[in-house]
Amino acid sequence: MMMQWKTVRQSVIAALAVTCSFMAGAAPPPVAAPAPAPVSYGVEEDVFHPVRAEHGMVASVDAAATQVGVDVLKQGGNAVDAAVAVGFALAVTHPQAGNLGGGGFMMLRTKDGNVTAIDFREMAPEKATRDMFLDAQGNADSKKSLTSHLASGTPGSVAGFTLALQKYGTMPLDKVIQPAITLARDGFTVNDALAIDLKTYGVETLPNHPTSKAIFWKQDGKPYQKGDKLVQANLAKSLELIAKDGPDAFYKGPIADQIADEMAKNGGLITKADLANYKAVERTPVSGDYRGYQVYSMPPPSSGGIHIVQILNILENFDLHTYGFGSADAMQIMAEAEKYAYADRSEYLGDPDFVKVPWQALTSKAYAKSLAQQIDVNKARPSKEIKPGNLAPYESNQTTHFSVVDKDGNAVAVTYTLNTTFGSGIVAGDTGILMNNQMDDFSAKPGTPNVYGLVGGDANAVGPKKRPLSSMSPTIVVKDGKTWLVTGSPGGSRIITTVLQMVVNTIDYGMNVAEATNAPRFHHQWLPDELRVEKGFSPDTLKLLREKGQNVAVKEAMGSTQSIMIGPDGALYGASDPRSVDDLTAGY
């Protein structure tokens, strides 16, 4: 085990050495990267056509929330105003992942080209300890980290949205939050997505807590179904408090009182001091150049940005366009590149306020070239040669992403979550607010996979005031100095590869945003050693991949991208993912 870890560590150290040698002129000049494919925006001969608008656009997982955002844009609000309005609305209409009691990340590119990242990831409470999720035998106890009051970190969504609005928005908080208040107070019609998730996932946790059951279960003992009206009066009151008193209502006022009381009575750790001390943080985005495009994504504590750039750097050494979309060779190259990135993720990534992340080494072109040289297009490298691991028993797609672009060119990409579907299933007191189970994203025990099958090390160990590692990857791509693609996705460990394929599909294969969204996806996260593919790839291609040594498994759909592309004429082209029901891209 130690030798295997040493091998991974040496790879990063070697990258630094190679980088230095490049700078010293000792290495041969790099081969010119293949050119990107011609860009498509959705012309008549394309199979799938995006939504087109001239002035502003919103893409989200929920039609009602999308319309809230479009209305804000029509009223003269900018992309940040609309994004914050959508974020609060999703907390009402998409409680599977939209939230006030969770956290996430925002990527923002202003009309003048400034790019920034807002980190509103949850934080471990002050009383959190490294071994808090281990049982008497020293093994990780997933019940504690997923469904108990210990599972919740200090929420960040309210702080993140209000910070963004205050610094980059133009509208007052009470105005952008009003649509969410109305939806909660007056009710909305339950759609297919919510009805299915209540029946499939909610039944596991929500009925176990009286305050949760009272909201999402009807008096006949059944969860709300499609077509029912769902009213959330307590959540409306919480939203009204935030509209009136700002984030202090949540972090220092009556909402904080109820959250802290809920935790104190039930063995949770979050205190009023934890809430009062929480701060959203503005960070410098991860950036990279891919075939002449600039890619901006989230820095740690998200692993997404670093590894999207890392994988793209590896892929830049191959002519994917010539191989062709869906070819066995292209999929082989991408799967092998993904293995290396996810291996590094387990060792080096964590909260940058607590651990030193080798950011420059992991995203260097030299390191990527050294990894590319190890990829055999004809033979897969077994993951056990990098590091062994175990398969987690359960996965959830329930994060949510939305993208917004306004008439002036401001662009926002937001991914936020409760972690698993409906989070811990616990509603804090009479707030109507579902609490997250984000503490499971820490490494409860080094080498043991979390709920998404991801293995972590000491860098992501539980610790007071730490933010757990995430895969969330809101991403903005720039072409010729202008915002070109705004994208992101839910999907747990598969977020990184889903967003990666949106970038590759549009740049390397020349797909329009709708084609890139509809194209079948695949994923390799190194452990388990499995190339997971959606339906839609040729059986002959899968046969060739197996012959190359890939452990191919055809499984359910991956991700739910919400993306907007900006054409050279300034027109907006958007697409919501057909893998989700009831989502919507709309503009004006």
Language-model region placement:
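Short, small/polar residue-rich loop motifs at catalytic or cofactor-binding pockets
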Residues: 282, 396-399, 421, 470-472
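Extended C-terminal subregions enriched in glycine
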Residues: 466, 508-556
